[in-house]
């Protein structure tokens, strides 16, 4: 992979997802922002014993300028995400689970919103929809939080919380100041998101794109 800079980097920890990871990667490749010019994927194989690693290696060979493949001994999702941070070359970063996916307009809408509000926020989030076994809005996307794209000041609108890392995008400069805590077995992503929001007491919501949560 060259020293090229990207608009968006996506870090995907990979473990036992050979049935789903190709669909996840394809949802990033098909982004209407233009994958080869503007998007980087960092695939971190967390010592997966199934065929996930082979699938990831094939994609990295197909898109050598855009996809970085990294192998590590199994250490958990937090360590895998922290490992992925060492390879990012994008202005904004998403941590995507390896069995989820994005709507095709997600990256372009998020990038434009960030550029319009760059000095105000470190984080932008999108609504989530359940798919496959269950369908409908994710419990964290119910209510009127995503009724319109806007900047939320949590000091004024403290009821509009955001906890889910995979539906969020973070400025890479801000992201590098915080690591995921590998000692936490649950809720490590919520802690990470909250730390990012508290830096400015504001974050953005974009109403149109959808993060699909399996």
Located regions from the model:
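Conserved nucleotide-sugar donor-binding catalytic segment
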Residues: 148-214
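Glycine-rich, basic loop-to-helix element that forms the pyrophosphate-binding segment
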Residues: 72-88
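Conserved donor NDP-sugar-binding/catalytic core segment of glycosyltransferases
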Residues: 105-138
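Short beta-strand/loop segment that forms part of the nucleotide-sugar
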Residues: 37-47, 68-73, 98
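Short, well-formed alpha-helical segments that are part of the catalytic scaffolds
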Residues: 17-31
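A conserved acidic beta->alpha catalytic loop
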Residues: 27, 45-54, 75, 97
């Amino acid at each position: 992979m060259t020293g090229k800079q990207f608009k968006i980097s996506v870090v995907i920890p990979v473990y036992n997802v050979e049935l789903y990871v190709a669909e996840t990667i394809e949802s990033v490749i098909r982004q209407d922002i233009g994958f080869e010019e503007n998007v980087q994927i960092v695939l971190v194989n967390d010592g997966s014993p199934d065929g996930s690693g082979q699938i990831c290696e094939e994609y990295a060979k197909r898109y050598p300028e855009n996809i970085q493949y990294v192998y590590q001994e199994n250490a958990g999702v937090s360590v895998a995400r922290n490992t992925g941070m060492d390879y990012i070359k994008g202005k904004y970063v998403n941590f995507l689970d390896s069995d989820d996916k994005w709507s095709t307009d997600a990256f372009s809408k998020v990038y434009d919103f960030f550029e319009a509000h760059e000095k105000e926020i470190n984080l932008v989030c999108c609504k989530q929809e359940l798919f496959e076994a269950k369908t409908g809005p994710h419990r964290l996307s119910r209510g009127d939080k995503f009724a319109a794209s806007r900047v939320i000041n949590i000091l004024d609108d403290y009821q509009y919380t955001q906890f889910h890392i995979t539906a969020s995008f973070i400025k890479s400069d801000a992201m590098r100041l915080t690591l995921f805590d590998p000692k936490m077995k649950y809720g490590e992503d919520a802690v990470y998101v909250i730390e990012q929001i508290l830096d400015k007491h504001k974050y953005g919501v974009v109403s149109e794109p959808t993060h699909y949560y399996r």
